[in-house]
Amino acid sequence: MRLLSVLVFLISVISIAKADYQYAFCKFNELSIGGVEGIAHLLSTDGTTLNITFDFTTSYAQNTQFAAQILTYGYNPSSMTNLGSVFDPTNVKTAGCPSGTPRAGDIGNIQANGGNVEAQTISLNIPNIKDDANSIIGRSIAIYGGSYDCSDPSKSVIGDMISFCTIGVGNIDYSSFDKSKLTGVNTASSYSNLENAIGLAVVYNTTITKGDYIEGRVLFKALNSSFIQVSAKVSGLSYQAHGFHVHQFGDVSSDNGTSIGGHFLKTGQEHSLPPSGTRHYGDFGNFCAFSQDMMDTGYYYYETDHVTAALVIGRGMAVHNFTDKGNSDVGGSRCGQGVIALIQDADYSLNLPMDWKWDVICANGSYYGDMSTSMNSESYNDNEPGSSSTVIPFFALIIFSIIFALL
């Protein structure tokens, strides 16, 4: 009996010592009003309670509190402040403060001192940052100039949105949390079964970039239950092939691109180029198509069933200085980075020139897409056999050799 008790105790200790956790990161965007600059950390150590810690400064020095909400979408390419309704997966519909029975996205009021907020934590029980229908990874947190009336939420005047941030999977190594208490692994994730997911990353330059200012967008859109379409347009790039990857973390706390971590992958996958079926989830090859009219703008187009759009929501993405050759040479430093946000508009498109011949391997380096008919590049797609471009010429060579021998 004593032995059984000891075993139960040891199992309990081991499970506690190796308990997984979820951590996410959110960096506030500056809007035309508010002058907000700062971040939010999201941490759950029990899978039930989500603790959101705010650290930001604003130009609203007169404010003693700010209303905060979790909104349905992480970004809107047409309107920065239209991010959908308050996140409400349980269909409560009525606004409220955490002390009552609010919608999942009603964070409540953030207390401020001279308009600034320092290390203030609010705990919520419905939203989470793990792989289920209540996950807010890829969605947004919005800050408003007004506040909730918690005694009568119907009278709340939260005012205009003064800032928002896209919630990405966080890199705990770049946080100020006591990591000695977090001995498991970070299992933060978007909801992997989210149907018809559309992800959009706004790309901006890292401090690695010298000279040109990099900016652009990368779009991940589900085509059907299996395939997604990945398209991108990024300006400020040098005329050469640039490695392109989805990374483990949607954490842009580091300006040099290191906090987004390594490539997004699952156990057993190895770094490679498309269309390898064993490559990392995040291995998308290279940008190498350029326009003669816009020589500093790189374009990308690819269709794949190797990963879903829902899985990459809330992850980071990077454009590298050089070519990813599919080996240990993955493209050098990260010159551009972004967080993949969940967006609403199913019709949104980057309007790429679809008559180009697309190449994501880029073995021949960069090329002008509008002159692709004269290029000797192959167009790669996961729904095409990767060897088809060499099999037919090989048999043609054999037949020609036989005919020549008979002459």
UniProtKB/Swiss-Prot annotation:
PROSITE patterns per record: SOD_CU_ZN_1 (PS00087)
BP terms from Gene Ontology: aggregation involved in sorocarp development; cellular hypotonic response; cellular response to starvation; contractile vacuole organization; establishment or maintenance of cell polarity; mitotic cytokinesis; regulation of actin cytoskeleton organization; regulation of protein localization
Side Extracellular, residues: 20-386
Claim: Glycoprotein is one of the keywords in the record: yes
Keyword Transmembrane: yes
Subcellular location: Cell membrane
Residues engaged in binding Zn(2+): 263, 271, 280, 283
Keywords from the UniProt entry: Antioxidant, Cell membrane, Copper, Glutathionylation, Glycoprotein, Membrane, Metal-binding, Oxidoreductase, Signal, Transmembrane, Transmembrane helix, Zinc
Matches recorded under InterPro entries: SOD-like_Cu/Zn_dom_sf (IPR036423), SOD_Cu/Zn_/chaperone (IPR024134), SOD_Cu/Zn_BS (IPR018152), SOD_Cu_Zn_dom (IPR001424)
Residues bearing attached sugar chains per UniProt: 51, 205, 224, 256, 321, 364
SUPFAM superfamilies: Cu,Zn superoxide dismutase-like (SSF49329)
Signal peptide feature range: 1-19
GO molecular function annotations of the record: copper ion binding; superoxide dismutase activity
Transmembrane annotation, as ranges: 387-406
Binding site for Cu cation: 245, 247, 263, 320
EC number annotated for this UniProt entry: 1.15.1.1
Record-linked Gene3D superfamilies: Superoxide dismutase, copper/zinc binding domain (2.60.40.200)
Required cofactor(s): Cu cation; Zn(2+)
Cofactor note: Binds 1 copper ion per subunit. Binds 1 zinc ion per subunit.
Biological function: Protect the extracellular space from toxic effect of reactive oxygen intermediates by converting superoxyde radicals into hydrogen peroxyde and oxygen.
PANTHER family: SUPEROXIDE DISMUTASE CU-ZN -RELATED
Designated name of the protein: Extracellular superoxide dismutase [Cu-Zn] 3
Native organism taxonomy: Eukaryota, Amoebozoa, Evosea, Eumycetozoa, Dictyostelia
